[in-house]
């Protein structure tokens, strides 16, 4: 029997995006047989990565292991100054320098991008898609967006998550 696939839900905040990650986890857990885990990047308390510093960091290695052991991802993060939140960029940098090959945590894995932002989050969604694809991640075409004026469209989210879990089961 094949091992169960694992989706890692990654939140870049302890607020609304963490709540969104928990809600998306609940949808997956209630509709599929895929294993899920939610992590909050804030809890890792990674130091700011600076080129030339020692890359042997136990916390970063633990985070890298989480990424390497996942089959797919759901990233929940807000738009921050028209792009990615710094905590997400910092985490990705640490992952890329603590794996054997800098893309090992990302390549050939599927991902859904989700955002809970004050506005549309479009600048984040576009720039993050580009970064994930560069890292070798296969990003689902449909995103999940929650704004101050629009709550989660549950049926739409269920379809998007179903498509992700369907691809993982192949």
What are these regions (language model features)?
Residues 12-14, 41, 116:
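Cofactor-binding loop segments of dinucleotide-utilizing enzymes, especially the Rossmann-like FAD-
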């Amino acid at each position: 029997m094949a091992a169960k696939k694992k989706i890692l839900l990654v939140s870049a905040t302890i607020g609304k995006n963490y709540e969104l990650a928990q809600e998306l986890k609940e949808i997956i857990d209630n509709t599929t047989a895929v294993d899920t885990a939610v992590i909050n990047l804030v809890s890792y308390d990674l130091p700011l990565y600076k080129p030339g510093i020692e890359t042997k960091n136990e916390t970063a290695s633990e985070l890298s292991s989480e990424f390497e052991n996942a089959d797919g991802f759901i990233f929940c993060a807000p738009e921050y100054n028209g792009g990615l939140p710094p905590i997400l960029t910092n985490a990705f940098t640490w992952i890329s320098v603590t794996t054997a090959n800098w893309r090992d945590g990302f390549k050939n894995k599927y991902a859904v991008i989700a955002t809970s932002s004050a506005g549309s989050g479009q600048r984040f969604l576009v720039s993050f898609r580009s970064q994930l694809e560069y890292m070798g991640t296969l990003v689902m075409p449909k995103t999940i967006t929650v704004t101050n004026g629009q709550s989660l469209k549950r049926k739409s989210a269920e379809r998007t998550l179903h498509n992700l879990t369907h691809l993982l089961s192949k």
